[in-house]
Amino acid sequence: MTTRLDDTFARCRAEGRAALVTYVMAGDPDPETSLQVLRALPEAGADIVEFGLPFTDPMADGPAIQAAGLRALKAGQTVSGTLALVRRFRAENRTTPVILMGYYNPLYIYGVARFLADAVAAGVDGLIVVDLPPEEDDELCLPTQEAGLAFIRLATPTTDERRLPAVLANTSGFVYYVSITGITGSATPDFGQVEAAVARIRARTALPVVVGFGVKTGAHAAAIARGADGVVVGSALVDALARSLDLDGRATSGSVAAVSALVRDLAAGVRAAAR
């Protein structure tokens, strides 16, 4: 049986293009606005959505996503609240894959078995948990896959040939290549280096390889899309939402439209790079 992720990548391949993967923080700046943004992403051209789980110590995230997480936590966002938003989204959209991205601690506190059962029931398609290495696969990776969800692993510029097989061993859904060394949103990737890295990973796996970190514009997305199976954009979208908020950090009438406008530009870039 194919999954929503399988179907999405197959559709994009049939169209001769990469997938656009968009990241936003659940509950930013409040749960209802966050749900409106989530609904708007596929309407504006996103193929896959990543929904961030807010956490108090997000070590891999840059200032934009850290600030988004703090806004979400201030608004009362929780793991169960995030699953409730996915459930409401899934009641209207049965085709767009939803990946939850975050850190292990909130899931551990929630309870792994309970979380996985609730995630499946809500309509989640996979997880990206950035602080669990392959050596800890028994903790979450293997139970996630046994529950029928994808467990997506990160590869980085420092993942060498000795380490790569371990990274890929229990990865499913797709491989997420982090195009820069550092935190999210911190630099523009070296597109030549990215192309070589994608080729190196593809030689080791049949899974789609998507590239993220540092992608800010439609032109950046087009450059990555020419060589990868997918392009992830996160900090730029979180920034667009943040700039639309009022002085008290609350959503305005233009908040959802601000995110949608950038997604349309990114989608146009990805489609312009169709091969």
Curated annotation (Swiss-Prot):
How would you classify this enzyme at the top EC level?
lyase
EC number(s) recorded for this UniProt protein: 4.2.1.20
Q: Where is the active site?
A: 50, 61
Cite the GO molecular-function annotations of the record: tryptophan synthase activity
InterPro entries in the record, alphabetically?
A: Aldolase_TIM, RibuloseP-bd_barrel, Trp_synthase_suA
| Catalytic reaction equation(s) | (1S,2R)-1-C-(indol-3-yl)glycerol 3-phosphate + L-serine = D-glyceraldehyde 3-phosphate + L-tryptophan + H2O
Quaternary structure note: Tetramer of two alpha and two beta chains.
Q: Which NCBIfam families match?
A: trpA
Q: Which HAMAP family match?
A: Trp_synth_alpha
Q: What does this protein do?
A: The alpha subunit is responsible for the aldol cleavage of indoleglycerol phosphate to indole and glyceraldehyde 3-phosphate.
PANTHER family xref list: TRYPTOPHAN SYNTHASE ALPHA CHAIN, CHLOROPLASTIC (PTHR43406:SF1), TRYPTOPHAN SYNTHASE, ALPHA CHAIN (PTHR43406)
Descriptive protein name: Tryptophan synthase alpha chain
Question: What organism is listed for this UniProt entry?
Answer: Methylobacterium sp. (strain 4-46)
